[in-house]
């Protein structure tokens, strides 16, 4: 049996812009992707901390160091620039491995600069 678990999360990301006319997706700074163990085209679940809205989309890699979190297409209707969101990816894992699996958590500041990074259940690593 396989179970669906949190794989990684960018916590407290701030939406920097939106492009309603784009085909869809969320553009994320490539440095943040690397730190959070996320990859381009990966499906994400986003939660808007300002209004409670939840939406799914996929990742587009943004420019390294830009600290960009841009919502594209219909997702741009779900959060406005300045809104704080949580970006999560999930993985299917064999049930016998699930108890030892540890998701990666990246916490960013209000400018999307990485603050801390850790595996769930392990000590924070300030960045």
UniProtKB/Swiss-Prot annotation:
It is found in: Cytoplasm. GO terms for cellular component: cytosol. It catalyses: L-aspartate + H(+) = beta-alanine + CO2. One of its GO terms (molecular function) is aspartate 1-decarboxylase activity. Binds 1 pyruvoyl group covalently per subunit. Its cofactor is pyruvate. Is synthesized initially as an inactive proenzyme, which is activated by self-cleavage at a specific serine bond to produce a beta-subunit with a hydroxyl group at its C-terminus and an alpha-subunit with a pyruvoyl group at its N-terminus. InterPro entries: Asp_de-COase-like_dom_sf, Asp_decarbox. Heterooctamer of four alpha and four beta subunits. This is Aspartate 1-decarboxylase. The lineage of its organism: Bacteria, Pseudomonadati, Chlorobiota, Chlorobiia, Chlorobiales. The gene is panD.
């Amino acid at each position: 049996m396989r179970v669906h678990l949190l794989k990684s999360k960018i916590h407290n990301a701030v939406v920097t812009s939106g492009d309603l006319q784009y085909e869809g997706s969320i553009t994320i700074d490539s440095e943040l992707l690397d730190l959070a163990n996320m990859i381009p085209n990966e499906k994400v679940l986003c939660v808007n901390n300002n209004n409670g809205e939840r939406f799914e989309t996929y990742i587009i890699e943004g420019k390294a160091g830009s600290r960009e979190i841009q919502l594209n297409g219909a997702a741009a209707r779900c959060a406005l620039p300045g809104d704080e969101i949580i970006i999560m990816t999930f993985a299917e894992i064999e049930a016998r491995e699930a108890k030892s699996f540890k998701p990666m958590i990246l916490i960013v500041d209000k400018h999307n600069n990485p603050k801390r990074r850790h595996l769930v259940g392990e000590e924070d690593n300030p960045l």
